[in-house]
């Protein structure tokens, strides 16, 4: 079976790079997308969610924020603001971030940036969901 490379990049640099990938599953704006070697070249937006990478020796789950993916026949490049492997997620920190975001959303203070609080809540809930995929 032909395999490909998957690289996930944030503003801080590459946070995930895996060779020998058999299939990658992405959550795009058009729905879930499976990518294998030889896929037609594509660029599309992805939602906050997770990337599931099946490679020769196992499966990785990576929590990602909104971003873009560039697919070539032999390589998939994912460009996002944040990315974190499931096993690296600090569950207590994610729970704390979720509680803070919910508190901000429930606070009727006009100084509260509602959109920012909603994004923070979405990221925290996503991190918790992805960490649960390992159980």
UniProtKB/Swiss-Prot annotation:
Query: Cellular location of this protein?
Result: Cell membrane
Q: Can you tell me which family this protein belongs to?
A: Belongs to the ATPase epsilon chain family.
What GO cellular component is one of the record's annotations? plasma membrane
- Gene3D superfamilies, alphabetized: ATP synthase delta/epsilon subunit, C-terminal domain, F0F1 ATP synthase delta/epsilon subunit, N-terminal
Q: What is this protein called?
A: ATP synthase epsilon chain
Q: How does it sit in the membrane?
A: Peripheral membrane protein
Identify the CDD domains for this entry. F1-ATPase_delta (cd12152)
Q: Which InterPro entries match?
A: ATP_F1_dsu/esu_C_sf, ATP_synth_F1_dsu/esu, ATP_synth_F1_dsu/esu_N, ATP_synth_F1_esu_C, ATPsynth_dsu/esu_N
Question: What gene name is given for the protein in this entry?
Answer: atpC
What is the annotated role of this protein in its UniProt record? Produces ATP from ADP in the presence of a proton gradient across the membrane.
Organism this protein belongs to: Staphylococcus carnosus (strain TM300)
One GO MF annotation is: ATP binding
Determine the domain of life of the protein's source: Bacteria
Q: Which UniProt keywords apply?
A: ATP synthesis, Cell membrane, CF(1), Hydrogen ion transport, Ion transport, Membrane, Transport
Chain spans, region Disordered = 90-115
Q: Which Pfam families match?
A: ATP-synt_DE, ATP-synt_DE_N
């Amino acid at each position: 079976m032909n395999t490909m490379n998957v690289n996930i990049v944030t503003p801080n640099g590459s946070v995930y790079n895996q060779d020998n990938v058999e299939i990658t599953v992405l959550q795009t704006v058009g729905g879930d997308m499976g990518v294998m070697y030889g896929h037609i070249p594509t660029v599309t937006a992805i939602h906050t969610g997770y990337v599931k990478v099946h490679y020769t020796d196992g499966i990785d789950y990576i929590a990602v924020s909104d971003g873009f993916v560039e697919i070539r026949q032999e390589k998939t490049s994912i460009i996002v603001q944040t990315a974190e492997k499931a096993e690296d997620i600090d569950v207590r920190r994610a729970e704390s971030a979720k509680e803070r975001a919910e508190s901000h959303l429930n606070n009727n203070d006009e100084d509260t940036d509602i959109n920012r609080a909603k994004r923070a809540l979405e990221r925290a809930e996503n991190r918790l969901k992805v960490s649960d995929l390992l159980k």
